[in-house]
Swiss-Prot record:
Produces ATP from ADP in the presence of a proton gradient across the membrane. The catalytic sites are hosted primarily by the beta subunits. One of its GO terms (biological process) is proton motive force-driven mitochondrial ATP synthesis. This is ATP synthase subunit beta, chloroplastic. It comes from Nicotiana bigelovii. It is found in: Plastid, Chloroplast thylakoid membrane. It catalyses: ATP + H2O + 4 H(+)(in) = ADP + phosphate + 5 H(+)(out).
Length: 498
């Protein structure tokens, strides 16, 4: 943790014992601290408990002030384990909120909630820090233009386009390709937009965080040889950490992303996995602070906490933060206050389907379940909108016919329906795409497909011009020209076999 939120601070060593307090009560991760009269810290100030435990090991626990109790006492939430703390230990008020390192030096590194590196690669080579608590950009600073954020992934750009500076909910179970999709987006924004990414692991499994780091190194998203050329900074607050850390780790990641947007004037991708855990941690802290619970046991400040995080994720005249948030839905109940509050902030939803993953169609994005508020003719244009609607209609009709096909077979369908089914199967396969980050295990070179190329390809399939090509020619290709070339190769191979 950096104490001084300026470009000159040199970390915790700058602590001065000008305003010491004493621990008077410890209840799990919550501490009550007494300060001298007239020396009370502000809400959100970082406190540091220093001392030695019963076996002489040094203790250095950072806390954040949450309540002023009266009688010169404050209640603070610890950001790390409170094991070994005792009443009477000295507490120092740092005079500022938790501040974390920001800038290019954070790329390729893993941090905890306090901005301390946890990857055993030494200290972070920067003195620039920023406080994790700040206001959302003023209305006059916002960029209100509605523009599409091109990802180079066909199914996303055509059917559920992302808004530049928007928020996208990513829904998917285990093993359907969520991590690979996240890594491809990180890779594509770096190549096409010259942007960077920040990944906030909020209350996730330590194993998953480790897997993601290893996969990013394998795929080149994190460059081990030259760490400065990496495209992503990772911030983790895992499941085993106290609720204070899980509640604030999202703000740490967001603070790093804001610096890239506001100072470096870049487009930034911010991943939060999982936004539900942010709410869950807030609920735990709220109960520990003695607040009256609200609906379903959630904190009464749920909407305020969510709003203060989400409103900072936006486009300004300098750059944009586009956020992709994994959303866990407890017991599949979309009316639960946690997902319901999240939905109010989302511009698009990307739903990953286990059925498509089972067919081997990757990315396994469900074209009918995924939605976007950007898919309107006045925003994307008539051509894009019409093509997307026709693709959805074709796939919906194919879905309706599948029961008949399963019972009676294709031959019982009318000529018109048989043609529609053939085109729908081509569309389904053409929605698949080889990924750059998956090259290591598929052997197929990755493809970035521009939006204009994507629209042209689907228009050709819908018009019937490609009815004569086999459907396997459309599987795992980039643009439509590759599909026609693949069809010719398949034909040549079959002729040689004869």
């Amino acid at each position: 943790m950096r104490i001084n939120p300026t470009t000159s601070g040199s970390g915790v060593s700058t602590l001065e014992k000008k305003n010491p307090g004493r621990v008077v009560q410890i209840i799990g991760p919550v501490l009550d601290v007494a300060f001298p009269p007239g020396k009370m810290p502000n809400i959100y100030n970082a406190l540091v408990v220093q001392g030695r435990d019963s076996v002489g090991q040094p203790i250095n626990v950072a806390c954040e002030v949450q309540q002023l109790l009266g009688n010169n006492r404050v209640r603070a939430v610890a950001m790390s384990a409170t094991d070994g703390l005792t009443r009477g230990m000295e507490v120092i008020d740092t005079g500022a909120p938790i501040s974390v390192p920001v800038g290019g030096a954070t790329l390729g590194r893993i941090f905890n909630v306090l901005g301390e590196p946890v990857d055993n690669l030494g200290p972070v080579d920067t003195s620039t820090t920023s406080p994790i608590h700040r206001s959302a950009p003023a209305f006059i600073q916002l960029d209100t233009k509605l523009s599409i954020f091109e990802t180079g992934i066909k199914v996303v750009d055509l059917l559920a386009p992302y808004r530049r500076g928007g928020k996208i909910g990513l829904f998917g179970g285990a093993g359907v390709g969520k991590t690979v999709l996240i890594m491809e987006l990180i890779n594509n924004i770096a190549k096409a937009h010259g942007g960077v990414s920040v990944f906030g692991g909020v209350g996730e499994r330590t194993r998953e965080g480790n897997d993601l780091y290893m996969e990013m190194k394998e795929s080149g998203v994190i460059n081990e040889e030259n760490i400065a050329e990496s495209k992503v900074a990772l911030v983790y607050g895992q499941m085993n950490e106290p609720p204070g850390a899980r509640m604030r780790v999202g703000l740490t990641a967001l603070t790093m992303a804001e610096y890239f947007r506001d100072v470096n004037e870049q487009d930034v991708l911010l991943f939060i996995d999982n936004i539900f855990r942010f709410v869950q941690a807030g609920s735990e802290v709220s109960a520990l602070l003695g607040r009256m619970p609200s609906a379903v046991g959630y904190q009464p400040t749920l909407s305020t906490e969510m709003g203060s995080l989400q409103e900072r994720i936006t486009s300004t005249k300098e750059g944009s933060i586009t956020s992709i948030q994994a959303v866990y839905v407890p017991a599949d109940d979309l009316t639960d206050p946690a997902p319901a509050t999240t939905f109010a902030h989302l511009d698009a939803t990307t739903v990953l389907s286990r059925g498509l993953a089972a067919k081997g169609i990757y990315p396994a994005v469900d074209p009918l379940d995924s939605t976007s508020t950007m898919l309107q003719p006045r925003i994307v244009g008539e051509e894009h909108y019409e093509t997307a609607q026709r693709v959805k209609q074709t796939l919906q009709r194919y879905k309706e016919l599948q029961d008949i096909i399963a019972i009676l077979g294709l031959d019982e369908l009318s000529e018109e329906d048989r043609l529609l089914v053939a085109r729908a199967r081509k569309i389904e396969r053409f929605l698949s795409q080889p990924f750059f980050v998956a090259e290591v295990f598929t052997g197929s070179p990755g493809k970035y497909v521009g939006l204009a190329e994507t629209i042209r390809g689907f228009q050709l399939i819908l018009s019937g011009e490609l009815d004569g090509l086999p459907e396997q020619a459309f599987y795992l290709v980039g643009n439509i020209d590759e599909a026609t070339a693949k069809a010719m190769n398949l034909e040549m191979e079959s002729n040689l076999k004869k």
